[in-house]
Amino acid sequence: MNKFLLASIAALFTWNLQAQFWSEVDSDFPTESTGISRFSIVDENVAWGIGYNGINPENNIQQFSKTTDAGSTWNAGSIGIGNTNLGIGDIAAIDGQTAFIAVYPRIAGQNGGIWKTEDGGGSWAKISQTEFTSSGSFPNTIHFFDTDNGVVTGDPVNGNWEIYTTADGGSTFTPVPAANIPAPQTNETGYLAQNTASGDSIWFTTSTGRIFHSTNRGLNWNVYQSPISDFGGSEVSGDISFADASKGILQTNAAILYSTTNAGQTWTQIVTSGTGTPYGDNIAYLPFTSYIVSVGSDPNFAGSSYSVNDGVTWVNIDTKQHVDVAFLNTSAGYSGGFTSDTNTTGVFKYVGDVLSAGDEFAFAKAISLYPNPTRNELNISGTDRVLNLELFNLSGQSLKVFQPSHSLSLEGLPTGLYLLKITTPLGMQSIPVLKN
């Protein structure tokens, strides 16, 4: 095992760096220069994105595009919400049929809110008339942790942040009490689609450079000051992403990077190296890995790049315009592009193996078993990352299915060698377990 891990570590630095990374496919938006400002990836087959006008973002677009075949083809559709002046700020997809959107007012006197589709985007309905109804209400972000639990964040209203949670699949949303959220600073607001999540933890960023953080799906919040003064200003802006509940990265519009290992409470500037550079727009950690992808859309500083060591060393991928970037794991990831008259552009689909060559190493860092060999009890670390545990004998027969837990009982099983199949967001791996 140790030799294998050492070989995996060495492989991190010996990949073919010229391997293909992106495959550009048609986003199916009908108008040229339509971009994708936000992705929501459900699984390796299903992902949704929302469109925007790449020539003049002030020209409102109410459109989505969706794939159900792992990004090979995308089908665009209109978001019919009954008012063409409302903006589509963020999207949270549940499956190929169901998705939620955060809708914001673009004209004074109107109200946004939360809309939902249950027929693949064919029709959209407002959840209720009770959320974001004040004159200053402005929904910014929406995220679902699973099919039942979600959170929507908005700007402050009457001196308090307007945040709602749901635990019933979006049938009802409950306001988070002001006592559970640190008070806003003077003129502080949030930003459209500027949130990131890992497990039960979620973060959103603000106009004063602060980062709000919840560890319980939005029910309670803490706030930390970041190294920058604004996450969406004309002079200073930034983006954040987290690999897990603690490890994160912050990228500024000047391509300066900061890292955190305590969920964003403190940040340390990264001294970068390598032949490439991070870009100044969006950044994405691949969950539970050391891999990061950075993208930029500024025509004077456009492109994409990646790092395999938490943002220290960078390799350039291309110099095309990229908007949003999102990864589910080491095999499913997308970046937003723009449509063209050739009907061949709009979505960058990850097709390489650059970010999967070190899966064994990343998996080993995420999960550990001890003691191994064992008599009866087997302890497991990193259970917050475990989706499923199943024990097999060497003949391939399933013996036990465990609920994710810190301790697994092998009592009643004869001594011998077994295989524990562990499923995490990184994929599946079978680890030998010896019972004495």
What are these regions (language model features)?
Residues 1-21, 357:
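Bacterial Sec-dependent N-terminal signal peptides
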Residues 20-29, 57-80, 113-131, 162-182, ...:
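Asp-box/BNR beta-propeller loop motif
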Residues 277-280, 314-328:
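Conserved blade-ending motifs and adjacent loop-strand segments that build the rim/top face
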Residues 350-370, 398:
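Residue-level detector of functionally pivotal "anchor" positions at catalytic/ligand-binding pockets or at interdomain
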Residues 417-436:
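C-terminal tail/sorting-segment detector
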